[in-house]
Amino acid sequence: MSITKEKKTELITRYGGAATNTGLPEVEIAIMTERINNLTEHLKVHKKDNHTRSGLLKLVGKRKRLLNYLTKVDVLRYRKIIAELNIRK
C-alpha cells in the first residue's frame, strides 16, 4: 500500500514550503507517517501478513530516528510536527 503521487506532492508542499524541499526532516516524517497509517489499516484487515508487519516496524524505527534528529536540531520544529501529525512521543 503505497501513497499516490498527488498525496506525496501535497505533503511535500504542506510541510516543505516548496515542491523541491523533499529532504527536510518534516517532509520525510510526514511521508513516513502517511505510509505507516496505510500499513496499519492494511494490517487490520490482513492480520497474518508478517512481511508487511516487519516493514512497518522498520519504517517506524526510521521515523523515530528522524524525530530524534529533529529534536537535537530544533525542538520547536519537532513539537510543531508532532502536534500536526498527532504522533505520540
Swiss-Prot record:
Coiled coil: none annotated. The gene is rpsO. This is Small ribosomal subunit protein uS15. One of the primary rRNA binding proteins, it binds directly to 16S rRNA where it helps nucleate assembly of the platform of the 30S subunit by binding and bridging several RNA helices of the 16S rRNA. Forms an intersubunit bridge (bridge B4) with the 23S rRNA of the 50S subunit in the ribosome. SMART domains: Ribosomal_S15 (SM01387). SUPFAM superfamilies: S15/NS1 RNA-binding domain (SSF47060). Part of the 30S ribosomal subunit. Forms a bridge to the 50S subunit in the 70S ribosome, contacting the 23S rRNA. GO terms for cellular component: cytosolic small ribosomal subunit.
